[in-house]
UniProtKB/Swiss-Prot annotation:
Heterotetramer composed of 2 PDSS1/DPS1 and 2 PDSS2/DLP1 subunits. Its EC number is 2.5.1.91. GO terms for molecular function: all-trans-decaprenyl-diphosphate synthase activity; all-trans-nonaprenyl-diphosphate synthase (geranyl-diphosphate specific) activity; prenyltransferase activity; protein heterodimerization activity. Belongs to the FPP/GGPP synthase family. It comes from the Eukaryota. This is All trans-polyprenyl-diphosphate synthase PDSS2. It catalyses: 7 isopentenyl diphosphate + (2E,6E)-farnesyl diphosphate = all-trans-decaprenyl diphosphate + 7 diphosphate; 6 isopentenyl diphosphate + (2E,6E)-farnesyl diphosphate = all-trans-nonaprenyl diphosphate + 6 diphosphate.
Amino acid sequence: MNFRQLLLHLPRYLGASGSPRRLWWSPSLDTISSVGSWRGRSSKSPAHWNQVVSEAEKIVGYPTSFMSLRCLLSDELSNIAMQVRKLVGTQHPLLTTARGLVHDSWNSLQLRGLVVLLISKAAGPSSVNTSCQNYDMVSGIYSCQRSLAEITELIHIALLVHRGIVNLNELQSSDGPLKDMQFGNKIAILSGDFLLANACNGLALLQNTKVVELLASALMDLVQGVYHENSTSKESYITDDIGISTWKEQTFLSHGALLAKSCQAAMELAKHDAEVQNMAFQYGKHMAMSHKINSDVQPFIKEKTSDSMTFNLNSAPVVLHQEFLGRDLWIKQIGEAQEKGRLDYAKLRERIKAGKGVTSAIDLCRYHGNKALEALESFPPSEARSALENIVFAVTRFS
């Protein structure tokens, strides 16, 4: 059974998706000025999101869900997949990550590669530099740009796999045997490293030192961002004094840098000038920020939310809530939500919803959405540009 086949069979085996107590990563956010008017117009539902992605995939030529398939079907990763099967029945998060590679609609693990392809097509060939005219072009996209999209996905998936490494010091008896978690961690490290190695090999084959530099710096940003997210101890992480400006800086590193620099690299491969490269970078940056904030807001706006559902205490709505409330009152609210050493997320969620944090996070999401749309105005009207706009509309509408 190869890796792709294993992924397709995993949902059959996995009932509950319970994950261990705490992973070795988690995020954080500072104040918003005026947000400005919003230009979005589409409904943000899973069905609509899937439609937006499906239409975009038709524009770029093939489903992005198969972009990294060449790597995932390699003999080396097939051997790893056989080891992953041994984790079925455990609660190691690597299984959840693997399942998400096939069945992930809203987060769309292939979103980054899709955006790289769309912005490549939206920009088209350089009108000034004709040195790329001998490159293969399919559906308005150079072959090297398609390779870049695959590389972007490989890096993203590798980091997701590595983020699934469990902090063994924080395991509880309900998380299952220690040996299962140790084995799962070894497989997560091995498979993540393998994907990163393939991405590095693909970058070398592009034979463009600036693109290599951009993607290498994006990888450095990712690692630095995750380090900041995980820089506090278990005892103090729920009371971190993080402002929204700091949160935005850290979130760009961990969630926006890869897409922003990949979009810029796609323009470099087509020999576009610095201005076009910067606009592509700005779109990738602000779209990624909108997508992240939207995900942060979901636990607070879903109509049906389980009382046991947790949320990230360093997410955008929570950090903004703390800013508006003040440090002392925030710590008091956390203390009041503690019951027998456990945090009552349902009670804390209601306190946060009663404040300004959620609405301010929605405003911040739309602010970044507007910035992404402004960047697209530098590109000529086209189907690809419309698809990029629709992606922004989909991640910035909350009705």
